[in-house]
Each structure stands twice: as C-alpha cells, then as structure tokens.
From Swiss-Prot:
Its EC number is 2.1.2.1. GO terms for molecular function: glycine hydroxymethyltransferase activity; pyridoxal phosphate binding. Keywords: Amino-acid biosynthesis, Cytoplasm, One-carbon metabolism, Pyridoxal phosphate, Transferase. Catalyzes the reversible interconversion of serine and glycine with tetrahydrofolate (THF) serving as the one-carbon carrier. This reaction serves as the major source of one-carbon groups required for the biosynthesis of purines, thymidylate, methionine, and other important biomolecules. Also exhibits THF-independent aldolase activity toward beta-hydroxyamino acids, producing glycine and aldehydes, via a retro-aldol mechanism. It comes from Neisseria meningitidis serogroup C / serotype 2a (strain ATCC 700532 / DSM 15464 / FAM18). This is Serine hydroxymethyltransferase. GO terms for biological process: glycine biosynthetic process from serine; tetrahydrofolate interconversion. (6S)-5,6,7,8-tetrahydrofolate binds at residues 121, 125-127.
Amino acid sequence: MFSKSVTLAQYDPDLAAAIAQEDQRQQDHVELIASENYVSCAVMEAQGSQLTNKYAEGYPGKRYYGGCEYVDIVEQLAIDRVKKLFGAQYANVQPHSGSQANQAVYASVLKPGDTILGMSLAHGGHLTHGASVNISGKLYNAVTYGLDENEVLDYAEVERLALEHKPKMIVAGASAYALQIDWAKFREIADKVGAYLFVDMAHYAGLIAGGEYPNPVPFCDFVTTTTHKTLRGPRGGVILCRDNTHEKALNSSIFPSLQGGPLMHVIAAKAVAFKEALQPEFKQYAKQVKINAAAMAEELVKRGLRIVSGRTESHVFLVDLQPMKITGKAAEAALGKAHITVNKNAIPNDPEKPFVTSGIRIGSAAMTTRGFNEADARVLANLVADVLSNPEDEANLENVRKQITALCDKYPVYGA
C-alpha cells in the first residue's frame, strides 16, 4: 500500500532536486522558445492525478477494458470542449503528440508511395510535413514548397507544384513562419487537383482559439494540433475535422493502428486546458501574445537586426543574425548565459548547417502567460539586442542578466 504522506523529496531526493532546479530555471529565465509555454496548476493537477493508473483502450462507450465509466466522462469532456473551441464536428483527443496525430491523418487515407505536398523544413515547415529524415518523407513521395523572394509563402508555387505532381494530400501549416496563412487559397488549390487538404495548426492553435488568427477547420478535410505551445495545455495532440466523413478511418488509425491505451491523465489535462481556452480572458491573452511579438520584432529591427518576412502576424518570428556576424548556435548560448532562452533556427537559404544556423526563433507565448505587456516586450527585445551586439563580453551578459532577473521577479510564473 502506498502512503499519501510520503513526498517525492522524501522518497527520491535526487529526482526532486532536479525538478526543483528546473522549476527555479523557469522562474529565473525568460522563455522565448516559440513552442514552449507554462500550464496552469489545474492542468498539472489533472496530469498528476490517479487517472494515470487507468488503462482504457478504445473510445468512450466502446472500451476493451472494464472500469472505464469515469474516464469515459473525462475523455468526452475533452472531446466536447475542443470541438466547441474550434467549431469542429469530429475530434480525437487521444494522440500522444502532434507528430502522432499527423501520422494518423496520413495513414487514414494515404498508401505508401502516395504524393504529399508540404512546406519545406528549410523554409519554415515541420519535420512531419515530408522532411526526408522523418517517416512522412520516407513513407510517402514528398514534394515541398517554400517562400518567394519576399519571404512570403509562395502560393503560386504551391499551385504550380500541385498541378505538376497531382498530390493526394496538400499539407499546410508551419513551425517557423510569422505571417498568416491563407487557408481558403489552399482549399482552392487542393480542389483544382482533387487533393485532401490537411492543416497542422500546432503553432497557431491558441491564437486561433482566441480569435487572433484565421481558423482552418471550415476549409480543411483534416486539422491537427498540439495541445501545448500557444494553447497552454499539456504535451499532446488532437485531430479535428469539420464533419464526420473520416471518423472511422481516423479513430482506427490512432487505435489500434498507431497507439495502444490512451494517456487518460494527459487527456484530463487537455480537458482542463480546453476549458481555460474557452474563457473570455483567453481572448485577451491571445491578443497580447500578438502585440508582444510585433513589439519585439519592431525593436529588433531598430537595433539593426533583420526579421524574416519583414514582420510577424502571429506569436513567432525568425531573426536573421547575419548582420551581427554571429551564428544561431552562438546566439542561443550567449542569450542563455543572460537567462534568455531561445532556439537556433535555420532561415530561408541558410548557408550554415542545421545544428549551427544563421538565425534564432523567438516566440511571445510563454512570456505573455507570465504577464509581460507591450512595454516589457520592448525592453526585452532591447536586452536581446544588447546580448547579440556583444555576445562575448561577460560584463555585458551580467548586466543583461540582472535586468532579466528584475523582470522575472516582477512576473513570477506561478503566483500565490
């Protein structure tokens, strides 16, 4: 019998110490990685609940195990809430990740060797959209599109490639593209060649839920998202559709094809996050995320840096570091010393290797969750520029670090 009185610190002090150190790091550093965010205490409570003990293969009302009457309630809450959030008729909340959600979509209607048309990883796409190193690029014949000379998504190229290659599926969505994507234009192109349209909205889902970015669901055959990033939920995935045409194929593609039992404690945490995203205050959050990202981009341009695509219309943007004569790898390290966390990221036509890069990716979702406003975002952008202008000067890094500490103390991740 387990005792409820035994704490993790008592039983496993080594692990507890590592968790405490990570908790302190999150408090002391400003998080600018676009794919990261902070979840509420309610989300963490759900994910740390006794639901982790329950196996529940199948779907609500159709389980292969007994004792599922309460986890059925949990999963149905998550399904109903996410459908309401995005105006979908179908939802599957079981994918363990966005990548697995994407795999399930492909497997539901494609056969190995079928052609897919997705955004190039080098131009801001995602590994799972047909990159050669990913299963999507190994199992299917992947053709890629990119940005035009102005670093705007090249819809003319998408149409030309679609007409030339006749893909069975067109994939839209990105992991490092700052501007709004025209879902209606993609629908028009897909219809011209009789292709399925699949949108991966993982990065933009929170903005879409908050009404600050166009909703792809009405235009698409399939939509996937992660539940973290801008949506501020636990790490996981979701599949959505505007109707129930592919319900049977998608459900079987997740279980039993790709996964076994769902993670009921994570699904519970998803349900909490969906409820949070349905509240009026989430709309204010999404609006502030965009304001903060735009403010940071503007300040960095004033400091001599170049923003890929010229601006941002979302939570994310890429910074071209070539004018500063510094690589993304070096910038990430220097900013880290100043307690600013970013990730190195390739820019279009990047001359550097993927593990070095000529850019960094910046996102405003996590800092906005802490409470940073537009004025704070502008201060922060100038601190980033201070580091990049003199990345090897320890006194400079120390000065920035002190100012970051003051900002972080002003906006704790978790208040009283």
